[in-house]
């Protein structure tokens, strides 16, 4: 594997581990959407909210008759009857299908960004080459090879003679060709005028 490929894998591994740890640490901090005892739907939110104290980082709720709210660790352990220090699996949010959907969606968004970058760099090759050279990223892969892009007028390889053009075999039938001149309007038909009414 090349050093560039190994470096890319290392970066992806670090990003994956950071995202995975963030997901595991955030499951207590999310108040998921819920319906109260009157049947009204309440949207979910992330703790702490902008209006909350920064120590209120956990989601508390007593039952369906009381709204969910952000609370501190002591209140969370009293209300939810969960010991955060004893088990890391205590009050884990279990919406695995939504979490899987977020990961799949994130993967496709990342792939779209990579493809967009590759398309942009292919369309703006000269600009990208200048910036990469300015940043110190250069190499043989940056030089355009006319053979790579399917140039019909290929340059001869070293040690080869240039191919000589050959005349066409025999006379070719001549098709009648129309001759157009721009000198005058002698041969062009007159323009027709149409009456138009404005409505």
UniProtKB/Swiss-Prot annotation:
Pfam families for this protein: Shisa_N
Annotated membrane topology: Single-pass type I membrane protein
Chief location category: membrane
Positions of region (Disordered): 146-199
Glycosylation-annotated residues: 53, 95
Cytoplasmic face residues: 119-199
UniProt biased composition (Pro residues): 164-174
Ranges of biased composition (kind: Low complexity): 152-163
GO annotation, cellular component aspect: membrane
Parts of the chain on the Extracellular side: 26-97
N-terminal signal peptide: 1-25
Name used for this protein in its record: Protein shisa-like-1
Species this protein is from: Homo sapiens (Human)
